[in-house]
Amino acid sequence: MNANGTSQRRLTGGLSPAWSPDGSSIAYASPGHDPNPPLSGISIMNVDGSGQHRVPNTDGGEYPSWSPDGKRIAFNSNLSGDHVMYIVIVDGSGLVDLSSVGEGWQVDWSPDGRSILFTSHRDHPDNYTDVYVMRPDGSGVKRLTHDGAYTPAWSPDGDHIVFSAPGPFIMGPDASDVSALSTPGVGETSLPDWTD
């Protein structure tokens, strides 16, 4: 659809679409044919809906996020019963298993390619989630929020992070300067993202 909401057109079924950095492709969680798992994996298509193909080695994958160079995709899969994060080259090769980090989902790759945001309830026995950041190799995990937060997204310049808690908030990449964004009349907001 257009930025103003007009000219909506269905391209395919699926969840959590993510634009490629060059704007030519969309990665998404493709629906499965069996409710267990409900998602068959990560697929990629051209922006007009053509060229749909499944990325090998992404079984049960969801929440895809492109690397800034468009060569890799970070995602999570719940096939093992835990939300395990992975990185794969777009042709399905070079799968990196980040299970050593622990559970995580709702990944978002930083514009400089050096960090990945993710959501986890690893530090909460009552299962609410917070936002964390790590390097693409799974090292340097740091918790950024402490009062429940989800759906993080980097700003295009990498200077800010937007997230829900449950309304939209913004903070610096080091978790500084947290502030609520005003959305009068909108109600509860989730899945915030940036636009250029």
Give names to the regions the model predicted.
Residues 1-196:
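Sequence signature of WD/YWTD-type beta-propeller architectures
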